[in-house]
């Protein structure tokens, strides 16, 4: 019988804009030994407003910084969970890059896909735009529609969290799911 060990898990926070990825990630970080690496915060720290492009190249660059930071944290054993936030992970290549990274470091991974109705997501986005509460200035209803149209389905194992069902129930679901992955036998 193989003993179950609790090992670090890199978590992809996937979902359309406004579906609650950051809210769920922050709530999980309060409950678990976790670090949240937010692409939008990283971009804002690296680039002055006039240098922010919201381009695929800049997003991919920031994702690589997230992964380098994750490798550093994993090497220091400073977090059991690394939550990758601030990117929709709407494209397969984005998710595959994270899975490749995890394979290279022999680290477990999980995908949490946040979902909600279009009306709720758009209302959240409109509120954030009006109040200027999000670091990504391109995070608008138009971006939601653009990403939804080009979304590539997630074929990997995942937990779908309906963020309309209340934060506590979604976080509880995610906590149980992540604990199972962290304790799987090798």
Question: Which residues does each PLM region occupy?
Answer:
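Phosphate-binding P-loop
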Residues: 2-8
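Hydrophobic anchor at the beta1->P-loop junction of P-loop NTPases
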Residues: 13
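The conserved Walker
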Residues: 17
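Conserved glycine(s) of the Walker
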Residues: 20
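Conserved substrate/cofactor phosphate-moiety recognition/catalytic segment
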Residues: 23-78
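Glycine-rich phosphate-binding loop used to anchor ATP phosphates in small-molecule kinases
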Residues: 60-105
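Conserved phosphate-donor/acceptor-positioning beta-strand/loop module used by diverse small-molecule
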Residues: 103-125, 161
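Small-molecule kinase domains that catalyze NTP-dependent phosphoryl transfer to phosphate-bearing small molecules
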Residues: 130-173, 181-186
């Amino acid at each position: 019988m193989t003993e179950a060990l609790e090992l670090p898990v890199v978590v992809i926070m996937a979902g359309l804009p406004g579906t609650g990825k950051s809210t769920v990630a922050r709530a999980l970080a309060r409950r678990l030994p976790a670090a949240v690496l937010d692409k939008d915060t990283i971009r804002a720290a690296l680039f002055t407003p006039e240098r922010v492009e919201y381009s695929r190249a800049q997003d991919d660059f920031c994702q690589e910084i997230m992964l380098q930071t994750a490798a550093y944290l994993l090497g220091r054993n400073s977090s059991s969970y690394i939550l990758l936030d601030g990117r929709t992970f709407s494209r397969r290549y984005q998710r595959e890059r994270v899975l490749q990274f995890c394979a290279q470091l022999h680290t477990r991974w999980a995908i949490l896909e946040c979902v909600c109705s279009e009306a709720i997501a758009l209302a959240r986005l409109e509120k954030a735009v009006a109040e200027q509460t999000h670091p990504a200035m391109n995070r608008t209803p138009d971006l939601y529609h653009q990403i939804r149209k080009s979304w590539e389905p997630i074929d990997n194992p995942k937990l779908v969290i309906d963020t309309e069902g209340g934060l506590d129930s979604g976080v509880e679901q995610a906590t149980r799911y992540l604990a199972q992955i962290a304790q799987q036998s090798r």
